[in-house]
UniProtKB/Swiss-Prot annotation:
GO terms for biological process: defense response; response to jasmonic acid. SUPFAM superfamilies: HAD-like. Belongs to the APS1/VSP family. This is Vegetative storage protein 1. May function as somatic storage protein during early seedling development. It comes from the Eukaryota. PANTHER family: ACID PHOSPHATASE-LIKE PROTEIN, VEGETATIVE STORAGE PROTEIN 1-RELATED. Residues 1-17 form the signal peptide. The keyword Chloroplast does not apply. InterPro entries: Acid_phosphat_B-like, Acid_phosphatase_pln, APS1/VSP, HAD-like_sf, HAD_sf.
Length: 270
């Protein structure tokens, strides 16, 4: 009989969150005995109906923010308490957001702005200026699947979202520097009325443009926002900076420096 090493047993325990009744013992033994366990892990786990678990949620979060962990549908179930603590209890989310926004302000303050054009800063909306935490708190802080479009329906029903104070401070400081905000969101245009009301309620009352996605558009967030930015540049705007909570907000033909805010709740493909 082959003896499985303790280290491999611990590795399996750290990477498998639950075993469905269809999972086969030979398949698991194959995974444990494999000399290339990490190469075979994802394929075998998928085949056996298992899901990957992350024993260190702080490390998982780092992987998300650095775009090393991508294409996840939900937060790992075992990381619910970590995400709640990060966003609510420990205030670390606020501290991290403050650091990003402070650096954005220092960068903007040091710019030599052009006098012959309109200098603008691109803001994302959800989880940049406004927070979706109240919504995702109802669904296990991102650990539970929600139906496509459920968040938009929630907003359309009249629910408002709180402002994110650190980004709101940046918004105010940029206005004082003479840099005008342009808000680009992947919210449907049919949500413009509730969006404007929500923005005004948190103190965002001035913007050069508030651009929402055409109803029913099939463009990905990356393509949509890239097209909007290119259109703004062609109109003569000088984009000096960009801030958002997803890399999808910030990649592909992005003039000016980009600043990535933390968000462990969900992932938008980039």
């Amino acid at each position: 009989m082959k003896i499985l090493s303790l280290s491999l047993l611990l590795l399996l325990a750290a990477t498998v969150s639950h075993v469905q009744s269809s999972a086969s013992v030979p398949g698991l033994i194959e995974l444990l005995e494999s000399n290339t366990i990490f190469g075979n892990e994802a394929e075998l786990l998928e085949k056996e109906g298992l899901s990957i678990n992350y024993p260190n949620c702080r490390s998982w979060h780092l992987g998300v923010e650095t775009s090393n962990i991508i294409n996840f549908d939900t937060v790992p179930a075992n990381c619910k308490a970590y995400v709640e603590d990060y966003l609510i209890t420990s205030k670390q989310y606020q501290y991290d957001s403050k650091t990003v926004n402070k650096e954005a302000y220092f960068y903007a303050k040091g710019l030599a702005l052009k006098n012959d054009t309109v200098n603008v800063w691109i803001f994302d909306l959800d989880d940049t200026l406004l927070s979706s935490i109240p919504y995702y708190a109802k669904y296990g802080y991102g650990t539970e699947n929600t139906a496509p479009g459920a968040y938009w329906s929630w907003l359309e029903s009249g629910e408002s979202t709180p402002g994110l104070p650190e980004t709101l401070h940046l918004y105010e400081n940029l206005l004082e520097l003479g840099i005008e905000p342009i808000i680009i969101s992947d919210r449907w245009k049919k949500l413009s009325e509730v969006t404007v009301e929500n923005l005004k309620a948190v103190g965002v009352t001035k913007w050069k443009h508030l651009i929402l996605k055409p109803n029913g558009s099939k463009l990905t967030q990356v393509v949509y926002k890239s097209k909007v930015r290119n259109s703004l540049v062609k109109k003569g705007y000088n984009i000096v900076g960009n801030i958002g909570d997803q890399w999808a907000d910030l990649v592909e033909d992005t003039p000016g420096r980009v600043f990535k805010l933390p968000n462990p709740l969900y992932y938008v493909p980039s």
